Amino acid sequence: MTSMLARISSTAEAEAALEAGADGVECAVGADIAEIARAVGGRCAVTALAHPAYGSPADQISALGAAGAAKVRLILSEKDCAGDLRALALYSGPVRLAAALAPQQGDDRDLTALAARCGVTDLMIDTGGAGRLLDHCGPVALSDFTESCRAHGLACAFAGALEAPDMPRLLLLAPDALAIDFSMSGPAAFAQMRALIPSEKTRLTAPAAGKRVDFSLMSERGFGVDLDEGDAPTDCIFVRGLTVPMRIGAYASEQTRLQNVRFTVEADIIRAAHAGDDMRDVFSYDIITDGITLLAGREVFAMVETVAERVAGLILRHRRVAAVRVKVEKLEVGPAGVGIVIERRRAAETADIRQLFPGLRGAGKPKG
């Protein structure tokens, strides 16, 4: 289950964030941790941010822990990440240790291994105010980071000017936490993002009589639920002409080099019960594009037929998808493109509650 953390700097922001549904708070460097911890009153864990520029990490952790922080996240300096991590190893108290890396450091698996050896339990990629996370890191890089954290027993988290459209994309990777800057987003946008992230309080069971289930909201949270769609009307969402490099082909030489492959996907989506104008009411086409990008960036395929089936299967895991048509074209075979077009409908036996893309890093059935 992915937790939603609110980056806050005052007790007022902490109260507002908890009211909006935050699972935890991360306090800015310099915030009054003792005052915030008293205001929170045990309703959630309090994490404090620290930075090497403000003194010895071990001393900062001790002071912040004494003030009420259960966890301290050290923002690693870009010049000496390894040195900062080793400094964390000097701390031996009860406060849990976490760290934040810049996006360009997220692919350094040696740093991930060092973080684990130095007592860090939670590693985050954070742009640190330098723009949107997904402008710095694509889904494959973030997936690799998540996998590296899992391999070393670390929780993984993402931060960096996150917005509502980022939620379904990042949830595909099943991170342990997403951190949202509450002061930047504001209460309304924060609440919208909260609605897109599943929580332990989310009810996935059938509603009482007269209660309406917002299936589109459930979908954008990354879950599917049983629907008796029958002849329910559908709308078509499409991605056409998406060209990505991948290793594909029956010949060994094809499996060791990248070649361009073009995808066109049309998905018939069960129409929402009401018209909406935000991310809670739509099927995000990023689920399609990011799913293709992840497959292309992480696997080697022999046949276009296999690729088409995998893409169709990924999309059909989404419970609002009634049918999908997938066209896959190899563009570098002889004088013309070659490929396949398949059409698949969601089989009845797939109609249980599940997290989407369960093959990606530990995603599984949610707790009901």
Regions found by a protein language model. Give the residues of each.
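Catalytic cores of alpha/beta
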Residues: 12-20, 53-67, 106-114, 162-177
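N-terminal, polar/charged subdomain of small-to-medium soluble alpha/beta proteins
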Residues: 199-368
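Active-site beta-loop-alpha junctions enriched in small/polar residues
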Residues: 7-11, 28-30, 49-55, 75-79, ...
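Glycine-rich phosphate-binding active-site loops on the catalytic face of alpha/beta enzymes
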Residues: 23-32, 67-80, 124-131, 173-190
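N-terminal basic/disordered segments at the start of proteins
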Residues: 1-26
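Conserved anion-binding
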Residues: 41-140, 144, 148-155, 212-228
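Alpha-helix N-cap and loop-to-helix initiation/capping positions
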Residues: 9, 27, 31-32, 56-59, ...
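C-terminal helical cap(s) of enzyme catalytic domains, especially alpha/beta-barrels
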Residues: 35-39, 88, 134-135, 182-219
